[in-house]
Curated annotation (Swiss-Prot):
Organism encoding this protein: Human adenovirus C serotype 2 (HAdV-2)
Protein name, entry field: Packaging protein 3
Name of the encoding gene: L1
Compositionally biased spans, kind Basic and acidic residues: 76-85
Site (Cleavage): 351-352
Induction details: Expressed in the early phase and late phase of the viral replicative cycle.
Length: 415
């Protein structure tokens, strides 16, 4: 109800008194009425009966208010917010990713151990087990209750499964992005130009034109500082990894033209996996690398590969090709008043011409029709002293039409 109308209503106490008086004056039921009507009349006589309209109005008043206005609800189940929460509730399981959550807080190699432990416990865990009170009593030998051990194992299995699902989604998203970018022709052209540019910059790092072009290219990558810094220092040792990545992507996308789209996506994934393993072993100086660190390095190279392909797409659209597109008349810009008056002035100035010229004046390019000079007509064979050659068949107006290949000689005084 509108707040203004709500203010015009009588106070609740006065409304209750009016409704009680109306209830007391209610007519007695007929003897032929059903038992339900008789019981309702008896309840009204005792003062416990509440008419349906009054109950509906009471619930309506409760739903209109907020906060304390809802304290008069008959039961918690009738509370609007409780009903909304019950209708929208869902089983909440907190998201976990053993590879990426709580960065810098886990002990070294603990993520790897949790991941492998969850994978091993997944087959022997009883998912239908119901914990009872005796399960929470600690064991005399280990000091750990069976319930605590079961909950810990269930947490490890849940974390393992959620980690696997999130990594699967990350890999699918990467494949879809790579497939979409590699399928574009602009990406291949832009990657070819980018590779050619970085190769020239590597051979001549002190070239000022190349450095100026490098700053222009960097303007397309503003959202990732690591990629931006590596691109600015691509000729330095700390940017060598980006140069290797561009070379690998160029060899797959540009050089191998016979590969299908799926093969190119697979080759890029294999390259990211190989680069991740190589640099992970180079960091840890050992063939054994924790799986979480290896996955993080692979994810870094995947993001950088997407940055290179996106940058190639931005560079590939800068092609000096003239685009021929038919634009409908309705999409052209209309003439301004000044342009319209100028066209009208030219139209009025050419009113004395022939009828055909007047009819075709507003055709495309009709007002820009070129008429040859007198000397050009004489040189074409009209004879000396004749200003206008005999009209050709179908030429009205006394001016002979010539092709664009005809020679043009300026008159005396023309330049």
């Amino acid at each position: 109800m509108h707040p203004v109308l709500r203010q015009m209503r009588p106070p609740p106490q006065q409304r209750q008194e009016q409704e009680q008086r109306q209830t007391c004056r209610a007519p007695s039921p007929s003897p032929t009425a059903s038992g339900g009507a008789t019981s309702a009349a008896d309840a009204a006589a005792d003062g416990d009966y509440e008419p349906p309209r009054r109950r509906a109005r009471h619930y309506l008043d409760l739903e209109e208010g907020e906060g304390l206005a809802r304290l008069g609800a008959p039961s918690p189940e009738r509370h609007p917010r409780v009903q909304l929460k019950r209708d929208t509730r869902e089983a909440y399981v907190p998201r976990q990713n053993l590879f990426r959550d709580r960065e810098g807080e886990e002990p070294e190699e603990m993520r790897d151990r949790k991941f492998h432990a969850g994978r091993e416990l997944r087959h022997g865990l009883n998912r239908e087990r119901l914990l009872r009170e005796e399960d929470f009593e600690p064991d005399a030998r280990t000091g750990i209750s069976p319930a605590r051990a079961h909950v810990a194992a269930a947490d490890l299995v849940t974390a393992y499964e959620q980690t696997v699902n999130q990594e699967i989604n990350f890999q699918k998203s990467f494949n879809n992005h790579v497939r979409t970018l590699v399928a574009r022709e602009e990406v291949a052209i832009g990657l070819m130009h980018l590779w050619d540019f970085v190769s020239a910059l590597e051979q001549n790092p002190n070239s000022k034109p190349l450095m100026a072009q490098l700053f222009l290219i960097v303007q397309h990558s503003r959202d990732n500082e690591a990629f931006r810094d590596a691109l600015l220092n691509i000729v330095e040792p700390e940017g060598r990894w980006l140069l290797d990545l561009i070379n690998i992507l160029q060899s797959i996308v540009v050089q191998e033209r016979s590969l299908s789209l799926a093969d190119k996506v697979a080759a890029i994934n294999y390259s990211m996996l190989s680069l991740g393993k190589f640099y992970a072993r180079k960091i840890y100086h050992t063939p054994y690398v924790p799986i979480d660190k290896e996955v993080k390095i692979e994810g870094f190279y995947m993001r950088m590969a997407l940055k290179v392909l996106t940058l190639s797409d931005d560079l590939g659209v800068y092609r000096n090709e003239r685009i021929h597109k038919a634009v409908s008349v309705s999409r052209r810009r209309e003439l301004s008043d000044r342009e319209l008056m100028h066209s009208l002035q030219r139209a009025l100035a050419g009113t004395g011409s022939g009828d055909r010229e007047a009819e075709s004046y507003f055709d495309a390019g009709a007002d820009l029709r070129w008429a040859p000079s007198r000397r050009a007509l004489e040189a074409a064979g009209a004879g000396p002293g004749l200003a206008v050659a005999p009209a050709r068949a179908g030429n009205v107006g006394g001016v002979e039409e010539y092709d664009e290949d005809d020679e043009y000689e300026p008159e005396d005084g023309e330049y």
